[in-house]
């Protein structure tokens, strides 16, 4: 890509993000402490940014790190933030830290999920939970359907699976809460096609109310979600939390989450202990 083409791509991306965030050039100039005139010149290609300026603007626009790297490359610069593979990331100190967290949380479920809520790793308590839900979670983190197809285990797709909804007490509360979270994340990452596809699939799943399509900004979700799991004679009650890593220099790590389950009654606590053996 030649210099002129790069300038056009960067200018278009900058203007897109500013519009997506609902900011005027003056708003952005104040947030980034840059003159509105310079913002205008950058968006028309009359000025070229430095890599430092790209990062300043990205931070002012609250652009995710993965997209900030894209913005830097569009301006002709190298990526700023590392994007290691999951295997590479979890084969080092982080993997050992996750294992320690898993061990300390036993016998209660805990799992690591990626930005699309695919299960990356789980402790033994998590494996038992999936077994109760009728999910065959192998060591490779895949699930086999009745047709024999193989794919990642996705906790949101399981939650919205019509065949498993009866297993979730107060399914509308749990599902609507997670859908609002996904809608917020999709707004924050508008270029994430896989995330948009997941959101579209869930919104259009059978039995999902039409009014869930439009997120209600007045609804404030609690930091913890209560969930009841039912399977045959088994009933388990948990509070679930989602923890994110604070990783300002690593895209992959910043997109990982730890989903933890805490029992809310003695019956659930004892059953988790018995299942782990």
Provide a role label for each language-model segment:
Residues 19, 30, 59:
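Alpha-helical residues within the helix-turn-helix
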Residues 12, 22-23, 49-52:
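Residue-level signal for the short linker/turn that defines the boundary of a DNA-recognition helix
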Residues 32-48, 58:
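Recognition helix of helix-turn-helix/homeodomain-like DNA-binding domains
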Residues 52-55, 59-92:
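Short amphipathic recognition helices of helix-turn-helix/homeodomain-type DNA-binding modules
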Residues 90, 96-107, 113, 120-277:
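Hydrophobic protein-protein interaction segments
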Residues 1-21:
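A short, Lys/Arg-rich alpha-helix, primarily the initiator
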